[in-house]
Each structure stands twice: as structure tokens, then as C-alpha cells.
């Protein structure tokens, strides 16, 4: 690179940095007019803040710098870049120098240590019960037990996983307890970790690195992605990401296999079933599949395009046959409400990048994550457009679709902009950055021949690294009594999760409603119906989600039609964003106050009874 070009590049990078800060400054001035025609109430509606503001700001903040970066590399290094026709060429499949045979000792060692680590885990605490998030799962399950209905009995926030996970747990362990569900969630995290390693194996196939270097790449990336998930802490990867991992494990193989029939079947089926299980992840995956179909069409890969269309249709038919048209109709009504209203009901403002650091609680994290998103976009553009021998076309295209997923999945952070959701939305772009850094370091080591590496030394380095990272997490003394500890947790009576005051209230509610088949929960203490072992009378067990004119009408109709006798009107346990359900559902609240009277008011709990 000559001096003139180097100076130009430095100049353009400085402009790029300036654009990023300019976009950050302009962030707060991008504001759409507020309107709330559907009457949904949440933290954003209280301050008359348009829920789409942060999405538009995000598109501007990421889009403008990336457009400028693309412009300046074409301006300064056009001869080193590919043209558009390049992306529609026939795939050049790289000779596979990294089969499972190459890595099986490392893979088996990783899985072995993960299993040992799992056996050494502390059993779930028999004391803490999250009234909202645990209730999201336990109450839909109890609704199903009594009504034998899925979405017709439960309006869930995430999808079918809210219903199915406890049911599977109780079937697996043969007991209907909170502990069984909590242990099952730990098993799901273990599966998540194993799937993460499998995904990294396929990612490590990419590039022109020799096998001995790919072994190191696989090891380092595996350790990094394993650190993304935790059994007990809120972390980057969670059980919701199981479906994305399964999808990408099959999707990535579509880019280096000639016959893709079975892969097309799997990615189509996984997408549809993920929508059923976890709405937002399923929609993001469908956008990826839709983008892929468009690419197949333009690149004249008609066989794959037709297969995916057919398999999607086939998967939808299977879903209808499993659940029936009535259940699916209820489910799609829920999807519609969630898509158009969840940000209004549950949304929080995204902190202004840079300017919120040190001022807002999550300002620093929000800035870091959105900058990571931008950096991963710059890495993608460089990977896609430069005539590099490191990656083949098919490998570049996978990174493109993977980044699209990262880009749209960031919507979770833009919708609910608290620390937890921001962190959850930073996992995949972080992986792109780590892959690029490690790949670059390994390439420089190889180029400068710093280490005389061979296969045996690669294995040795990998074993040492894995041992150094994972072994300190293993509490070997816990392995001996693993069975007793976990059985104690699985079969622990639910009463152990309640304080004495809570037990008294639950007993009051049980006594008062002893002759009723159900209770209607109007609070955000969602676990109450499960604790009294009665289903919710309407499908709106999570009442705070049913905010908006049309859905409140349906709520009132269900109260009338089912002649609901008892309503738990208030609880001191939890309020989402400190907004009472009565303030969110004004029409339902008005109906309740007109038609119900107070029968119990104790320790912050209020139970209402239908007037005679």
C-alpha cells in the first residue's frame, strides 16, 4: 500500500468515526409523531413516546456509517473489490480439510467436561420463585392440565414454549412441581451449550486455514461461545436461542453441500416450529429464510427455491394437523397482538449512544452493544466485497445471512431496552467479532511462522486451554451426591417456594374459591393460579398483555360468557414498569369495578367476587 492510499484510508476512517458520533448526537432529534390508536398502555405511552422511534434511530445509526464505509472502500480500493455478479456465481465448494474426524478428540473432551460440570451444579434453590417469569410458564401449563387447550386457554408472551416446557418437565420427571420445571431449564441450557459447540464446528470449517489452525480456531471459539450461556445467571445466550442454533447448524451446511434437499426440509420445518415455540425468534428466522429464497431466485437456484416453498407449506400443514385450526387461529390472533402492540405495552427507550454513558443505568452497555453491531457490519462488508482468498463465495454468503439475523434480532433490545434484553441481543454480533479477531491472529501467526505448529501440538494446546477454562468451574465434591441433591429439588413441595405470609394468602384464596373451577388473575403475580392449583378462567392469565381497545373487548366478553365469579384484583409481589394492570386495561378495570365486590383485602392482596 503506497503512502498516498494509506493517508486516504486514515482520512476516510476519521470521517467514519466522525459520522458515528454525528449519528449519535442526532439520535435524540429523530422522533416520530406519537399516536396510540389501539389504546395500548405501557411505559412509552405514559411519556407519549412513539415505540418506533428507536427502530428508526437504529437504522440511521447503523445504516449511514455502513453506507459511507462501502462508499469509501469503492472509492479508494475499487480494483480489490468484487462486482455484484460475483454473488450469483455457482458455489465453489472448498475441499473439506476439517471433518469431524479432525476434531473429535477435542469435541468429545468438551462434551465430557460439560457433562461433568452439569453433574457438579448446585441444585436449583428451593426458595426463590419469580412471580412474573416463572408464572409465564407454570400457569399456562396448569391451564392445559384442566382445559386440555393450548392457546385457547393461555395468551402467552413468548409462544408455545411457555406451555410446553413445564409439561415436558413434569412428564420427564413424573411429578408436577416447580423444582421439576427449574431442573428441566438447566437441562435445556446444557443442550444449548452442546449445540453451541456443534455450530462452532461448522463455522470453523470456513477460511483457507490448514487443519492444525482450524483446531485452535474451533477450541477458542467454543470456549468463547460457552461463556455466552450460564445455568443460573442472566447471560447472552438463553434457552430461546436453542431454535436459532438448530436452524443455523443446518443452514450453514447448505453453503458447502451439493445436495441440499434434506437441509431445505430441516431449515423450513425448524422455522415454522420455532414460530410456534418462540414467536420473535421464529419471525427472525423466517426473515432469514425469506431473504435466502430471494437470493435463490436471483441466482437461478430454482430447485432449492421450490423445495423450500414446498417444505414450508408441508410444515404448516403438519402444524395444523397437530394442533387443529381452532388452536392455530387463537395462536395467530396472539401473534398479531404481540407484533403490533408488545413494544407499546412492554417497551423502554433505548439509551442514546455515548451521551447516555454514566447518566442512564444501561447507557454504557447500550453504547457498547450498538457499536459492536456496527463493527460486525463493517467486518461483514470487508469480508463480502474484498477479493480475499480467505473465504469462498458460499462462506461469505453465510456470513451475510448470519449478520442479517444479528441485525434484525437486535429488535429485542430496541423494544425492551433494559440491561437484560440489551445483553441478550449482543450475542451473535459478538461472535462475528471474536471469529474475525481470532482468525486474523491465527493468520498472522501462520504468516510470520511464530510457532512451528503441527496437529499433535494443536490438540495439546486445545486440551490445555479447555482444561484451564472449564475445570475451575467444576465442583467435584458435588458430583458424588448429584442424584440426591437434584431429586431433592425436583420433588420438593411447592410450599418451600413461599413465605409464611404468602402461604396464608394462598390458603385464603383456596378456601374462598373451593367450590369454583377457576380463578381470574388480574395481577402481574402470574404464578398465583398455579399455586392454588386452579386454571385461569379466561385465556388472559397474563392480564397486563391484554392492553388495547379490541383485546379488552374480548377480555370483557370472556368474563361475561364464562360468568367468572372470582378475580384476584391486586397483589404486592410485582408490577411491570410500576404500572398497575388497572391502569393498563382501563375498560376491563371499569367493567370489573362495576360488577364485582371486595371479599378479601389482606397484606396487599385483593380478591373480588361477582355481584349477586
Task: Report each predicted region and the residues it spans.
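Membrane-interface alpha helices of multi-pass inner-membrane proteins
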Residues: 264-279, 285-290, 318, 405-412
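Short periplasmic/luminal acceptor-recognition loop of GT-C membrane glycosyltransferases, typified by
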Residues: 156-157, 493-546, 555-577, 605-608
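Signature aromatic-anchored transmembrane alpha helix within multi-pass, membrane-resident enzymes
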Residues: 212-214, 309-317, 441-478
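Hydrophobic, aromatic-rich transmembrane alpha-helices
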Residues: 195-205, 247, 368-394, 406, ...
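Hydrophobic/aromatic-rich transmembrane helices and adjacent perimembrane loops
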Residues: 55-60, 243-246, 283-284, 408, ...
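Membrane-interface micro-motifs in multi-pass membrane enzymes
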Residues: 46-65, 159, 213-253, 277
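Short hydrophobic/aromatic helix or loop-helix immediately within or flanking a transmembrane segment
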Residues: 136-142, 152-179, 183
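Membrane-interfacial, low-structure loops and terminal tails that flank and connect transmembrane helices
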Residues: 1-8, 75-104, 391, 445-454
Amino acid at each position: 500500500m503506497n503512502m498516498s492510499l494509506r493517508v486516504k484510508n486514515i482520512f476516510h476512517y476519521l470521517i467514519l468515526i466522525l459520522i458515528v458520533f454525528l449519528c449519535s448526537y442526532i439520535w435524540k432529534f429523530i422522533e416520530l409523531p406519537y399516536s396510540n390508536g389501539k389504546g395500548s398502555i405501557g411505559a412509552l405511552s405514559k411519556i407519549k413516546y412513539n415505540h418506533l422511534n428507536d427502530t428508526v434511530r437504529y437504522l440511521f445509526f447503523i445504516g449511514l456509517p455502513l453506507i459511507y464505509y462501502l462508499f469509501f472502500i469503492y472509492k479508494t480500493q475499487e480494483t480489490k473489490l468484487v462486482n455484484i455478479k460475483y454473488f450469483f456465481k455457482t458455489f465453489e465448494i472448498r475441499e473439506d480439510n476439517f471433518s469431524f474426524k479432525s476434531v473429535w478428540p477435542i469435541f468429545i473432551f468438551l462434551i465430557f467436561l460439560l457433562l461433568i460440570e452439569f453433574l457438579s451444579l448446585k441444585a436449583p434453590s428451593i426458595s426463590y420463585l419469580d412471580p412474573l417469569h416463572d408464572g409465564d410458564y407454570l400457569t399456562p401449563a396448569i391451564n392445559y392440565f384442566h382445559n386440555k387447550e393450548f392457546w385457547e386457554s393461555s395468551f402467552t408472551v413468548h409462544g408455545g414454549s411457555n406451555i410446553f416446557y413445564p409439561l415436558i418437565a413434569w412428564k420427564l420427571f413424573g411429578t408436577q412441581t416447580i423444582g421439576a420445571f427449574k431442573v428441566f431449564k438447566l437441562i435445556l441450557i446444557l443442550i444449548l451449550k452442546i449445540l453451541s459447540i456443534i455450530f462452532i464446528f461448522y463455522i470453523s470449517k470456513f477460511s483457507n486455514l490448514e487443519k492444525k489452525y482450524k483446531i485452535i480456531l474451533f477450541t477458542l471459539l467454543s470456549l468463547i461461545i460457552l461463556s455466552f450461556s450460564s445455568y443460573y445467571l442472566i447471560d447472552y445466550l438463553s434457552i430461546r436461542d436453542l431454535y436459532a442454533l438448530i436452524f443455523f447448524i443446518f443452514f450453514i451446511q447448505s453453503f458447502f453441500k451439493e445436495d441440499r434437499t434434506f437441509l431445505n426440509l430441516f431449515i423450513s420445518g425448524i422455522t415454522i416450529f420455532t414460530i410456534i415455540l418462540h414467536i420473535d425468534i421464529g419471525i427472525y428466522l423466517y426473515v432469514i429464510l425469506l431473504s435466502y429464497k430471494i437470493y435463490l431466485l436471483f441466482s437461478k437456484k430454482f430447485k432449492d427455491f421450490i423445495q423450500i416453498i414446498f417444505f414450508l407449506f408441508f410444515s404448516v400443514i403438519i402444524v395444523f394437523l397437530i394442533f387443529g385450526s381452532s388452536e392455530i387461529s387463537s395462536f395467530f390472533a396472539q401473534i398479531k397482538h404481540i407484533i403490533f402492540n408488545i413494544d407499546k405495552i412492554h417497551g423502554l427507550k433505548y439509551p442514546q449512544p455515548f451521551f447516555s454513558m454514566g447518566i442512564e443505568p444501561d447507557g454504557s452497555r447500550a453504547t457498547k452493544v450498538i457499536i459492536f453491531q456496527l463493527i460486525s457490519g463493517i467486518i461483514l462488508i470487508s469480508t463480502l466485497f474484498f477479493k480475499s482468498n480467505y473465504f469462498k463465495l458460499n462462506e461469505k454468503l453465510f456470513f451475510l445471512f448470519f449478520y442479517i439475523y444479528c441485525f434484525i434480532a437486535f429488535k429485542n433490545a430496541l423494544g425492551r431496552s433494559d440491561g437484560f434484553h440489551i445483553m441478550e441481543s449482543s450475542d451473535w454480533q459478538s461472535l462475528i467479532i471474536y471469529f474475525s479477531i481470532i482468525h486474523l491472529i491465527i493468520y498472522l501467526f501462520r504468516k510470520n511462522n511464530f510457532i512451528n505448529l503441527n496437529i499433535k501440538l494443536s490438540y495439546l494446546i486445545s486440551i490445555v486451554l479447555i482444561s484451564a477454562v472449564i475445570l475451575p468451574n467444576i465442583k467435584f465434591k458435588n458430583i458424588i451426591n448429584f442424584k440426591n441433591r437434584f431429586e431433592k429439588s425436583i420433588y420438593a413441595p411447592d410450599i418451600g417456594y413461599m413465605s409464611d405470609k404468602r402461604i396464608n394468602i394462598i390458603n385464603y384464596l383456596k378456601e374462598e374459591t373451593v367450590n369454583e373451577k377457576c380463578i381470574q388473575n388480574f395481577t402481574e403475580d402470574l404464578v398465583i393460579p398455579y399455586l392454588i392449583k386452579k386454571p385461569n378462567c379466561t385465556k388472559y392469565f397474563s392480564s397486563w398483555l391484554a392492553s388495547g381497545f379490541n383485546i379488552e373487548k374480548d377480555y370483557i366478553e370472556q368474563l361475561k360468557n364464562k360468568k367468572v365469579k372470582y378475580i384476584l384484583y391486586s397483589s404486592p409481589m410485582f408490577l411491570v414498569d410500576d404500572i398497575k394492570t388497572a391502569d393498563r386495561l382501563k375498560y376491563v378495570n371499569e367493567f370489573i369495578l362495576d360488577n364485582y365486590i371486595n371479599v378479601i383485602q389482606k397484606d396487599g392482596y385483593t380478591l373480588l367476587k361477582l355481584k349477586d
